[in-house]
């Protein structure tokens, strides 16, 4: 009987381990800054888009994501409001940050809240963690996070249901919480404002 209970406990521990390990690694840092390279691959593995930019993340729920190429755009969240600035159309769109991020795996990088993990099954292979939505009616694909044992996020990948992949690789990672001023956003003069928070 004791042997059976031990085996059962070990089985449950093994199932829970990847999710716990990923959460623990993310919790090692209050934030980071990095540059990123982006590759979008077709379901057949062909590169259809490349880009680069800069990212700043401070937990909980603060981030600045600036794409420099191929098209400039900026996402900034102060934890309450999410601003999306598109210089090409000279427009800033405002969203409620929590609502905008709630249904995306990206929220795990910025918030690492225990209840967020309930929506995903997590598999671990070395430093790569694959998250699959548990909801049968989810339209999300899979999400992979590469993070070292020291809590350094090296990149992530979004794998759509149709097989298309968007891969972001981080470099020049500065493992410390960015200054709060990085997440303060002022709408540029002369641009159109579309407030979607109502």
Curated annotation (Swiss-Prot):
Endpoints of the signal sequence: 1-16
Record bears the keyword Chaperone = yes
Q: Where in the cell is it found?
A: Periplasm
What GO terms in the biological process aspect are recorded for it?
lipoprotein localization to outer membrane; lipoprotein transport
Supply the Gene3D superfamilies for this chain. Lipoprotein localisation LolA/LolB/LppX (2.50.20.10)
One protein family per Pfam: LolA
Keywords from UniProt, A to Z, are:
Chaperone, Periplasm, Protein transport, Signal, Transport
Domain of life from the UniProt record: Bacteria
Q: What is its main location?
A: periplasm
One Gene Ontology CC term in the entry: outer membrane-bounded periplasmic space
**Which PANTHER family does this entry report, sorted A to Z?**
OUTER-MEMBRANE LIPOPROTEIN CARRIER PROTEIN
NCBIfam families reported for this sequence: lolA
Q: How does it assemble?
A: Monomer.
Q: Can you tell me which family this protein belongs to?
A: Belongs to the LolA family.
Q: What is this protein called?
A: Outer-membrane lipoprotein carrier protein
